Each structure stands twice: as structure tokens, then as C-alpha cells.
């Protein structure tokens, strides 16, 4: 799918507020509501819009510790396994493959320092993970 200026404007609006109505988008961009809904559907069908998610404040949920964990792998052989393991953990908000010193960076939230230690032990037991930093 070719993304044009209008599509990019719609995406920018949705990134700020995923719950904004098609009517409000249409008014802001001075286009019709059916045009907005058709374009959003095409953006979803093409996979450009993968979903609309709530951004949560972790503290009221009892998640008081946020951390960035760098994983040092034995080799690139385990990259896929590490990524798949990270995606299964609810504490992991994001898993990035990196170059340089580490193989992956994990952005996590957890309850407290004790649960962080438990999480680190779990991650260090994954195949190919040499250590965490």
C-alpha cells in the first residue's frame, strides 16, 4: 500500500489519540468521514496499523520498578529464542535486538526490587544468555 500525505496525517492523529473519532479526524483534515474510515480500514488491512492499545501508568498497577536490561549472548545462534522468550513475559514492554556489546535490550516493569531479581534470574536461565547488565 502506498501511503500518501492524508494517510500520514491520519496516522499522526491516531498516534496522539487512538480513540479519536472519524468525525473529528475528518473535521481536522477537512475530508469526509467515509474517506477517513476507508483509509483507516486500508491502513489496518495492510498491516500499517497493527492495533490500538491503552498506555498504562504502571504505578497504580503495583509496578513500581522500571528497568532497561541489556542481555549478553553467547552467540547470534540464540537471538530468535531470546526474542520469543521475551515476548512471552508480561513484564517485558519492549525487546530490541542491538549491535555492539549486548544482543538485546529489554524494557521492563515489575513490582519491586525482589521481583526484579527473580526476573533477572529467569532471563539469565534462557538459552544463550551469558549475563545481564
Predicted features along the sequence, with ranges:
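A compositional/biophysical signature of low hydrophobicity enriched in polar/charged and small residues
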Residues: 1-133
Amino acid at each position: 500500500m502506498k501511503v500518501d500525505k492524508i494517510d500520514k496525517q491520519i496516522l499522526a492523529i491516531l498516534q496522539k489519540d487512538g480513540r479519536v473519532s472519524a468525525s473529528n479526524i475528518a473535521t481536522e483534515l477537512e475530508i469526509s468521514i467515509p474517506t477517513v474510515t476507508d483509509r483507516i480500514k486500508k491502513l489496518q488491512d495492510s498491516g500499517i496499523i497493527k492495533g490500538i492499545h491503552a498506555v498504562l501508568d504502571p504505578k497504580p498497577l503495583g509496578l513500581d520498578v522500571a528497568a532497561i536490561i541489556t542481555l549478553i549472548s553467547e552467540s547470534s545462534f540464540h537471538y530468535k529464542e531470546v526474542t520469543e522468550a521475551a515476548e512471552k513475559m508480561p513484564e517485558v514492554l519492549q525487546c530490541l535486538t542491538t549491535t555492539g556489546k549486548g544482543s538485546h535490550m529489554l524494557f521492563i516493569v515489575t513490582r519491586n526490587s525482589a521481583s526484579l531479581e527473580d526476573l533477572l534470574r529467569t532471563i539469565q536461565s534462557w538459552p544463550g544468555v551469558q549475563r545481564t547488565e
